[in-house]
């Protein structure tokens, strides 16, 4: 097994995510040693010490993009082009066309476990929510207790921190609250019923207007970390507080979406390839089919195409408001490695109307 070491910041994933991908086929080292086979320079402006040492040792130095191509080439050896109606080469053409002509812009959310409590107005998973002094805090009715309980914060998105996306707000604070429940508050019978979960939007907010953590605690408000510490039976998809960063991405339709086969046929027609009426499972071999999911990294996301474990639960015309994936190494897990997503219509999003949001959670 060849050894590899990385230097510089990756443009579209964390070092941890890149390492996880590489470990499937390489021995990953943290320093440049004499027996190192490959040094991947993820950032051309990265420090020169590792580069100089690698060149001195005769280590092969490649770019981040070249390394990803190496991973793809290794995968190609395991493909059977005869498995599907489309060959592997044709499948790659179709995937590229889907991204080029039919891709949807979104914002990928990267998580970092917070070392200390984050500012009240910051984008975050978990932690304490922003809440304006004097405003009534949202509660839910608990089957276990006589009195209503304060919601806990699942996610808070400060849209001033999010890359601009068509029809999405460029400012304002979105909050998603949840309750301790085996379905994380979701209602299978009515996915828009905000009884055990809640969406709250703030147009005008600031640190100066925010209640302090002490004031929130006095009202009975807890972070998810505190709720888990106080109740061993509490169930939430996250275990900690997470700082968030955002980057714009282009997503493509995946086989779990109702529109996938329609987009594949459009792409095939554009490329002058045969257009099949068979299902996606027949059109593509197993490996090619799975490649459309692009699921090598956690898909926490705003906008773009959603991801489902079981099947498309969105309504026709819905946009993805927010999606939280499972990220086991960081203590984020929806059931059995599932995903939670929230949808609304384009018109409701433009009007900042969050009363008809659809909440779905599923897992394998």
Language-model segments: which ranges?
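DNA strand-break repair and replication-stress modules
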Residues: 1-80
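Preference for intrinsically disordered or flexible, low-complexity segments
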Residues: 79-364
């Amino acid at each position: 097994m060849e050894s590899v070491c990385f230097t510089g910041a990756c443009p579209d994933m964390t070092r941890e995510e890149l390492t996880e991908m590489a470990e499937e086929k390489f021995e990953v080292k943290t320093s440049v040693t004499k027996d190192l086979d490959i040094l991947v320079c993820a950032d051309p402006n990265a420090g020169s010490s590792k580069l100089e040492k690698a060149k001195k040792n005769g280590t092969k130095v490649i770019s981040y993009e070249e390394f990803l191509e190496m991973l793809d080439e290794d995968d190609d050896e395991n493909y059977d082009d005869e498995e599907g109606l489309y060959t592997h080469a044709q499948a790659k053409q179709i995937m590229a066309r889907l991204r080029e002509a039919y891709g949807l812009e979104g914002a990928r959310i990267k998580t970092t476990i917070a070392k200390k409590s984050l500012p009240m107005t910051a984008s975050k998973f978990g932690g304490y929510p922003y809440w304006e002094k004097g405003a009534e805090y949202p509660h839910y009715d608990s089957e276990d207790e006589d009195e209503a309980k304060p919601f806990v914060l699942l996610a808070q998105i400060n849209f001033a921190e999010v890359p601009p996306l068509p029809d999405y707000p460029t400012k304002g604070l979105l909050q998603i609250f949840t309750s301790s429940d085996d379905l994380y508050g979701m209602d299978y019978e009515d996915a828009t019923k905000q009884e055990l979960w809640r969406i709250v939007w703030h147009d005008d907010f600031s640190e100066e207007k925010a209640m302090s953590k002490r004031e929130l605690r006095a009202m009975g408000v807890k972070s998810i970390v505190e709720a888990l510490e106080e109740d061993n039976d509490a169930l939430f998809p996250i275990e900690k507080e997470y700082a968030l960063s955002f980057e714009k991405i282009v997503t493509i339709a995946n086989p779990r979406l109702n529109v996938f086969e329609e987009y594949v046929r459009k792409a095939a027609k554009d490329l002058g390839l045969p257009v099949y009426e068979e299902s996606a499972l027949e059109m593509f071999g197993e490996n090619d089919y799975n490649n459309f999911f692009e699921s090598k990294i956690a898909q926490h996301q705003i906008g773009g195409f959603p991801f489902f474990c079981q099947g498309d639960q969105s309504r026709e015309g819905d946009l993805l408001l927010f999606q939280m994936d499972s990220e086991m190494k960081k203590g984020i897990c929806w059931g059995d490695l599932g995903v939670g997503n929230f949808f609304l219509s384009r018109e409701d999003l433009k009007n900042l109307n969050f009363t008809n949001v659809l909440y779905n959670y599923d897992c394998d």
